[in-house]
């Protein structure tokens, strides 16, 4: 059947989100799966806006945001207006960074640390609206401000977060080592793996804060296609994530303070694919968490493609596939899709969509042997049903658990954005028991 622009916009959905590979997916005016599903909104009818604001609010649990300011911003932003959202969050970030610098100059280190975390929250939120705004080029300066605040916050933690360099295929990945409260000479370690466009702040808030408080050391990093590795090192996604995690584990084992028998790993958002893929090959991992389980990344790109476009993809018709998308997408949506393609390292729509087909666990999930916890948030929009699929596919896991998060918990939606507390409780209680940690 012919593909009209109207039908294309109705069908494209999550594909325009670039696979919804982060804890905070976005679009630029397209109708998406996010518009059709989910719990009743608290603030915005536009599911993109709702998700980003809920995530921003959820970050406050571990001092990553000022709830009153976030609630104030919900009244300053027009539903669906990307320009107003970008401006509001960017200005809030500048304001919080100014507060941090003023506190630091006055010797108030804890106040400065918290304000730098607030600034990161606001700057990161701004980046998700940049591509649908009047000037998408403002993304990179906002990201650079976010990263600058992260770096400046590190020495203000107690103990300080330690910047580390992880050898990786002839270069170095930037990593960050978070010391836990345990006084053991060798401590359990939780490796924190991000999605595609999550911030380092989220690695602190969705694992680091809860882990260090319970006696775990934590290690996070920007891997290929993520953060600094993407924007400054030009390293791109790869489906064989065990080639990334192997060097990270090598680095961890080079430290005398890491207990080699108690190394765990957690992946959030698309990290729910990275981690199961890695542990299918990496046998030095003692336990793993996938939040949520992702068995096939490509479905969030291809599931809502109209059948004729899907046929072009399967037939390998690159020229026609690219030509249609280039003509059919309005400027804001094209900017969003082009941005979402960058972590894959391609400029062709066809090449990117085709590459996503390699990101699946079909032939490897049955090789997972370590204990595995898989979160299953109700109203998971981007990979619905895949947590259950991963649970069923991991037939060789020595112990596996599927943990549901519901609306009644206040913890539904992709990566439980507004409920890091209940998430920490369930994830770390399981991990404590699995690794015999007294958290």
Locations of regions flagged by a protein language model:
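N-terminal export signals
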Residues: 7-28
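N-terminal cap/lid segment of alpha/beta-hydrolase-fold proteins
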Residues: 143-182
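Hydrolase active-site cap/lid region
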Residues: 280-347
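Catalytic histidine-centered segment of alpha/beta-hydrolase-like enzymes
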Residues: 408-421
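Short beta-strand/loop motif that positions the catalytic acidic residue
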Residues: 368, 374-376
């Amino acid at each position: 059947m012919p593909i009209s622009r109207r039908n294309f916009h109705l069908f494209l959905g999550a594909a325009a989100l670039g696979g919804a590979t982060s804890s905070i997916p976005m679009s630029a005016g397209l109708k998406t799966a996010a518009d059709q599903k989910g719990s009743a909104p608290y603030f915005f009818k536009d599911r993109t806006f709702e998700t980003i604001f809920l995530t921003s609010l959820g970050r406050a649990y571990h001092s990553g945001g000022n709830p009153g300011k976030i609630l104030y911003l919900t009244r300053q932003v027009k539903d669906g207006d990307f320009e107003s959202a970008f401006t509001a969050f960017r200005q809030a970030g500048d304001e919080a960074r100014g507060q941090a610098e003023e506190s630091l100059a006055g010797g108030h280190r804890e106040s400065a640390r918290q304000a730098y975390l607030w600034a990161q929250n606001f700057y990161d939120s701004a980046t998700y609206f940049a591509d649908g705004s009047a000037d998408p080029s403002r993304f990179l300066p906002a990201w650079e401000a976010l990263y600058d605040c992260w770096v400046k916050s590190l020495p203000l933690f107690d103990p300080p977060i330690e910047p580390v360099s992880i050898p990786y295929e002839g270069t170095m990945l930037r990593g960050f080592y978070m010391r836990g409260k345990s006084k053991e000479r060798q401590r359990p370690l939780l490796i924190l793996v991000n999605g595609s466009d999550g911030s380092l702040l989220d690695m602190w808030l969705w694992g680091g804060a809860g882990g260090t408080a319970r006696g775990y050391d934590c290690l996070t990093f920007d891997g290929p296609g993520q953060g600094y590795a993407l924007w400054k090192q030009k390293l791109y996604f790869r489906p064989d994530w065990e080639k990334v995690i192997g060097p990270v584990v090598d680095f961890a084992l080079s430290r005398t303070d890491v207990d080699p028998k108690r190394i765990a790993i957690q992946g959030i958002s698309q990290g729910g694919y990275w981690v199961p893929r890695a542990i299918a090959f990496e046998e030095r991992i003692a336990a793993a968490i996938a939040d949520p389980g992702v068995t096939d990344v490509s479905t969030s790109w291809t599931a809502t493609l109209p059948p004729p476009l899907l046929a072009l993809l399967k037939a390998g018709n690159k020229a026609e596939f690219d030509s249609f998308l280039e003509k059919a997408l309005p400027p804001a949506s094209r900017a969003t899709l082009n941005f979402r393609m960058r972590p894959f390292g391609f400029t062709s729509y066809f090449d990117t969509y085709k590459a996503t087909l390699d990101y699946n666990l079909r032939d490897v999930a049955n090789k997972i042997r370590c204990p595995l916890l898989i979160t299953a948030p109700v109203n998971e929009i981007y990979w619905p049903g895949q947590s259950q699929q991963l649970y069923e596919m991991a037939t060789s896991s020595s112990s596996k658990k599927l943990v549901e998060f519901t609306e009644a918990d206040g913890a539904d939606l992709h990566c439980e954005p507004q409920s890091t507390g209940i998430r920490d409780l369930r994830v770390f209680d399981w991990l404590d028991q699995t690794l015999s940690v007294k958290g």
